A protein has these predicted regions:
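Winged helix-turn-helix DNA-binding recognition segment
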Residues: 61-114
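Short, charged low-complexity intrinsically disordered segments located at boundaries
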Residues: 67-72, 84-90, 122-130, 162-167
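Short recognition helix of helix-turn-helix/winged-helix DNA-binding domains
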Residues: 1-74
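Short, amphipathic alpha-helical interaction segments positioned at domain boundaries
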Residues: 118-162
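Short, flexible loop/turn elements at secondary-structure junctions
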Residues: 50, 83, 117-121
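Electrostatic interaction modules used in gene-expression and signaling proteins
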Residues: 166-180
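Charged/polar, solvent-exposed surface patches and flexible loops
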Residues: 40, 44, 59, 74-77, ...
């Protein structure tokens, strides 16, 4: 358990107030929750549903610095995590994981969520492939070179472009599915 984790409510609340977790030390890292760093380097550590939840809640909190009320069941459905709010529900596990890794913290029925993420600690780098460890170090060097106020984690060396999701205006077609 992380020092940043506050005591969670006894049960997952039906609604909670979402607020940005303002932490100047982390905000200075300049890896927004919507960055490639979050999606690529944090994903194998936090897991896909937790990263998706972090990106969704972090973006929402960043856009609403005074806070916003979140319907937990709707959030779960929007993330593809089902309807349940029980102790063993997917949304409860996802929110617990966010808090366990210091990406969010409960304060009564309020959830403070990070809008930027810190660099992955060395102890977690062992879980990553050599390519992702290299990407992590490359992005940290780039962030350090940009200085405070720069936007790190969005643009990085071409040598790592194969690891990044590729955007395309072409619809993706898969057997048996409809292009969106």
């Amino acid at each position: 358990v992380n020092d940043h984790q506050a005591i969670a409510p006894v049960a997952t609340p039906e609604r909670f107030a979402l607020r940005p977790w303002v932490d100047p030390a982390v905000e200075a890292s300049e890896f927004p929750v919507t960055s490639i760093y979050t999606e690529t380097v944090l994903l194998p550590i936090l897991g896909p549903s937790t990263v998706l939840c972090l990106r969704r809640l972090g973006s929402l909190a960043a856009g609403r610095p005074d806070g916003v009320e979140v319907d937990t069941a709707q959030l779960a459905r929007d993330l593809g995590l089902g309807d349940g709010l029980g102790r063993h529900s997917q949304i409860t596990k996802t929110l617990d994981r966010l808090c366990g890794f210091g990406m969010a913290r409960w304060s009564r029925a309020n959830l403070d969520v990070r809008t930027a993420v810190p660099p992955v600690p060395e102890r977690h780098l062992r879980r990553l492939s050599p390519e992702l460890v290299g990407l992590h170090h490359c992005m940290l060097r780039q962030a350090a070179g940009r200085g405070p106020g720069a936007t790190a984690g969005r643009h990085w060396g071409a040598q790592h472009s194969a690891l990044a999701p590729q955007a395309s205006s072409e619809p993706v077609e898969r057997a048996g599915s409809v292009s969106l």
